[in-house]
Design a protein with these regions (language model features):
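Class I (Rossmann-like) S-adenosyl-L-methionine-dependent methyltransferase catalytic domain
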Residues: 1-47, 64-71, 75, 85-141
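Local beta-strand N-terminus motif with an aromatic residue
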Residues: 51-52
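A conserved beta-strand element that flanks and buttresses the S-adenosyl-L-methionine
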Residues: 55-56
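Hydrophobic adenine-recognition pocket in adenosine-nucleotide-binding enzymes
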Residues: 60
Length: 141
């Protein structure tokens, strides 16, 4: 994100200290990345934000249970200033749960973040399970 999108500051929250060390070795020159070792719902709540921010989950939330994702989303909602953006490569569609692969319908996301305006994309269709898509953004209103 720093190199391709020219972001001035990226907070990379990761529960695995080993993964952080690997990232630092792969990208040793990324001085604009602040690595934070911890769980998202705990570490996000410590951020002091005064202007809109861009959140990206990549596809991480699909690997977590609903209860954990709810905690993360509620934390984001609590600290995010109006006009903040949440960009997700998360799968969406009919509910589907198996070990480390969880798909939630658009209503689940929009009900959880009621003050956010969502746009779900259909340009990436999943084949496992079929009939689901991947990718959406939301803006806090």
């Amino acid at each position: 994100m720093v190199e391709q999108r020219k972001y001035k500051k990226v907070y990379a929250i990761e529960p695995s200290s080993s993964a952080i060390e690997i990232a630092k070795k792969i990208y040793p020159d990324n001085k604009n990345v602040k690595y934070i070792n911890g769980f998202a719902e705990e570490e996000i709540s410590k951020l002091k934000l005064s202007k809109p921010i861009f959140f990206s989950t990549m596809c991480c939330l699909a690997h977590l249970e609903d209860e954990d994702v709810l905690g993360i989303l509620k934390t984001i909602d609590k600290i995010a200033p109006v006009d903040s953006v949440l960009a997700c490569s998360e799968p969406w569609g009919d509910f589907y749960h198996r070990e480390c692969w969880n798909i939630r319908p658009p209503e689940w996301w929009s009900d959880t973040l009621a003050d956010w305006e969502f746009e779900f994309y259909n340009d990436y269709i999943l084949t496992d399970p079929p009939g689901r898509s991947k990718g959406f953004i939301a803006i806090k209103k």
